[in-house]
A protein has these predicted regions:
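Short linear motifs embedded in intrinsically disordered, charge-biased segments
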Residues: 1-169
Length: 169
């Protein structure tokens, strides 16, 4: 988490690492002789964990979610053997690759899992809990107010139709 409460630098760093992992495996994953099932296993076993390392602490904004999903679709299109010029929709590419959820929603799932499993067990006086539950206090700035980690938890729970109080029970 950055000093300003954001996670953009972390997300960009993880996406660079994902791209480096992709470049290392590109010749294998573009091989037409290898089946989709084997390619998916490599993708799920190497690239997804590389991209989502430490995603539990991310409070992603929509711009960062878009970056994550764009890079994921670039990898999936290459994995399936479809270019942008083929004009195949993202949903069809996901169906061909047998991948149900976006990478950004997987990051949200990790945030919620950490919130539900680990966060509730941490003593309220420990520094980790105090930092993550803290409100980002800044003077009035132009634009949208800063979002903290707890705000991203609320957004992720809202996408599932839940509230923080309901999730704690």
């Amino acid at each position: 988490m950055a000093a300003d409460g954001g996670c953009e630098r972390n997300v960009v760093h993880r996406m660079n690492e994902e791209y480096r992992a992709w470049e290392a495996l590109k010749s294998v994953l573009r091989n037409r002789g290898l089946g989709i099932k084997a390619k998916k296993c490599l993708y799920e076993g190497v690239i997804v964990p590389t991209a989502l390392y430490r995603a539990e602490a991310w409070g992603m904004r929509s711009a960062e979610r878009r970056k994550v999903n764009i890079l994921e679709m670039k990898c999936l299109r290459s994995l399936v053997g479809v270019s942008l010029l083929d004009r195949v929709t993202n949903e069809k590419v996901r169906r061909r690759a047998v991948i149900e959820r976006e990478l950004a929603s997987r990051a949200d799932q990790r945030v919620l899992r950490w919130f539900g499993d680990d966060m509730e067990r941490i003593d309220e006086y420990r520094m980790v809990r105090r930092v993550l539950m803290a409100e980002v206090s800044r003077g009035r700035v132009r634009g949208r107010p800063w979002l903290g980690w707890m705000d991203s938890v609320k957004v992720a729970l809202g996408n599932k139709g839940m509230t923080v109080e309901a999730a704690r029970q």
